[in-house]
Amino acid sequence: MSFFRCIGRSALFMLDPEHAHRLAIMGLKSGLNSYQKVVDNRLCVTIAGLKFENFIGLAAGFDKNAEVVNDVFHLGFGFTEIGTVTPRPQVGNPKPRLFRLRKDEAIINRMGFNNDGRQIVYGRLHGYKRLGIVGINIGANKDTVDKIDDYITSIAYFYDVADYFTVNISSPNTPGLRDLQVRDSLHLLMNAISQARNEQKKKHGFFVPIFLKIAPDLSEKELDDVAEEMKLSDFDGLIVSNTTLSRQGLRECTLRNEEGGLSGRPLFERSTIVLAKMRQKLGKKIAIIGVGGIRDAKTALEKVKAGADLVQLYSGMVYEGPDLAITILKEILQFMQKDGVESIKAYRDQRVEYWAKHMLSS
């Protein structure tokens, strides 16, 4: 029985959310996990030159500082993403800054990129034999003068230890960060990052893919702009989406007005609509990772049907337990058996039109 099951969700929920998260990290470090991984070639996906053991990843935010890189693979994930990591250490926003909306199975956070900084994180990754694909989610310091410089220097800093990079310009908790999604700024940023990657490719002799992570709160016109810039750039894929500022449909009255980004069950519909719209705009070749509101096999599969090559989750694990990825994979294999499907890739795009026709609410 796992450390988490021994403690129990109800007991963890009695703790402050950040204390509970710290306890989860400590539990993973202790190695008290007994999950049987699901290994099946039908779940494998290859994108951007990387072969993923399965299509479910752990989203950024859980292992911010690369403390449990290998341990999370014992929870069944096919890949993990650490961070967000900034150039300099950052304490983040004042506490309390993390809130559970239990009625909605949601989380509001205004963490503010709290992390140990890239020097310490690099030290944890360098020379470390990893059990799977590890992405590094990079961001800008809150007080930085030149945000673009923070990204391009982090590309250089982490290049030899990253399997892929995620450029996070969509967190709502760093002032001015989402402004980088505006087309002129986005164009400058993506060009600068592409140039930095090309320089590192020449220096190291190998290629590291780059993904752009966007917000779910963009307008149709802004999504068009992102799509056009993606087509013009040599970025390898898109991650849809980060947390939302919307509070539409929440049942929780007390905490709904807390500032910060909302994740969990209520984000599923909005993020899936944006995912499908971006698949339509980008075409079939550019890779997309779907994130937001995944809590079971049906929601994970729906992301794939809406156009995702891979999916990520985090908040769902808070409510459903640490074995969520394994549970999903087992049920997906049952779906595939029932549907006569030989690969998870066969489901991709089956419901793009259905989701893309939905209007984005304000």
From Swiss-Prot:
Keyword annotations of the record: Cell membrane, Flavoprotein, FMN, Membrane, Oxidoreductase, Pyrimidine biosynthesis
Short name of any one Pfam family annotated for the protein: DHO_dh
Sample GO molecular function, one term: dihydroorotate dehydrogenase (quinone) activity
Binding site for substrate: K64, N109, R110, M111, G112, F113, N168, N173, N242, T243
An annotated GO BP: 'de novo' UMP biosynthetic process
Mode of membrane association: Peripheral membrane protein
Involved pathway(s): Pyrimidine metabolism; UMP biosynthesis via de novo pathway; orotate from (S)-dihydroorotate (quinone route): step 1/1
Assigned GO CC terms: cytoplasm; plasma membrane
Active-site residues, record numbering mapped to chain: S171 (nucleophile)
Domain of life: Bacteria
CC cofactor note: Binds 1 FMN per subunit.
UniProt cross-references to NCBIfam families, sorted A to Z: PRK05286.1-2, PRK05286.2-5, pyrD_sub2
Stated name of the protein: Dihydroorotate dehydrogenase (quinone)
